[in-house]
A protein has these predicted regions:
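Sec-dependent N-terminal signal peptides of Gram-positive bacterial secreted proteins and lipoproteins
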Residues: 6-28
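A residue-level marker of the well-folded mature domains of exported/periplasmic proteins
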Residues: 3, 26-259
């Protein structure tokens, strides 16, 4: 069997998080021409640790690139896009279609009406429903085996929810199925409030501080759409200085090592 060698080069824009991933593969034979695949990668933010985890190992080879149009002009064979707004991919779809460049959306799913526009549009992402169910199952198992979670002993768990962002399908599904799963597992809930924190630790800490100011020690459970926001909630409680036994239980999603 022939051994294949691959070189990877990435061009990334610091402003919009764009990259061109160049994959070159060739066999050991000298008479074969090297084949190169140029993949444009566009992420909505470089501040999201989950997204950064996809590109960290490539950062040594970063160079500037301004926008999606330049990726198409650069001759990319495929575009991989993490949308800023899942409801507004029409322009990039039109541009890619005009050049016959397949598009793979990831982590933020476009609305179905956009995905069915063209047979070369794809979506790759986690199963948000399953994530919500798993979070609910883990939380329910803990709550049902730790009676101290119900601090006021009223038979209900007073909770707040940190949601990723308005209109994000993953946030909607994670929220819906985590709460449904808790109730399905005989956890009686009383919702105190919810806050949007844009998947961000700092914003979650600020929102959690507001919730603590409003509800104090009434909060018995914090459900978060991701680990970053859950860690923000932890920081808020550290800042407030509550004794550890007065903290609520806090659950996130993503499996970040720090969490």
């Amino acid at each position: 069997m022939n051994k294949k060698k691959r070189r990877v080069a990435v061009l990334l824009s610091a402003t919009i998080g764009s990259a061109v991933l160049v994959l070159s593969g060739c066999s050991g034979k000298s008479d074969q021409t090297e084949k190169t695949l140029r993949v444009g990668v566009i992420t909505y933010t470089q501040d999201d640790p989950f997204i950064n985890g996809l590109t960290d190992e490539l950062k040594e080879q970063l160079k500037a690139m301004e926008n999606k149009e330049q990726m198409i002009d650069a001759g990319c064979d495929v575009l991989c896009i993490n949308l800023v707004d899942r409801t507004a991919p029409s322009r990039i779809i039109r541009m890619a279609r005009n050049e016959d460049i397949p598009v793979i959306f990831f982590n933020r799913e476009p609305v179905r009406e956009d995905l069915v526009q063209w047979e070369k549009l794809y979506y790759v992402g986690c199963d948000a429903e399953q994530s919500g169910i798993m979070q609910g199952e883990i939380a329910a198992e803990y709550i049902n085996s730790h009676s101290e979670v119900d601090k006021n002993k009223d038979g209900k768990i007073q909770y707040v929810l940190l949601e990723g962002e308005a209109g994000h399908q993953d946030a909607i599904s994670r929220t819906e199925y985590s709460v449904k799963t808790l109730m399905k597992n005989d956890v009686i809930l009383e919702k105190l409030s919810y806050q949007l924190a844009d998947w961000n630790r700092g914003q979650a800490e600020n929102r959690m501080n507001r919730l603590i100011s409003q509800y104090g020690k009434k909060i018995e459970l914090v459900m978060s759409n991701n680990d970053e926001m859950a860690l923000g909630a932890v920081e808020a409680y550290r800042t407030v200085g509550y004794a550890r036994e007065d903290w609520p239980v806090i659950f996130g999603i993503d499996g970040l090592e720090e969490a």
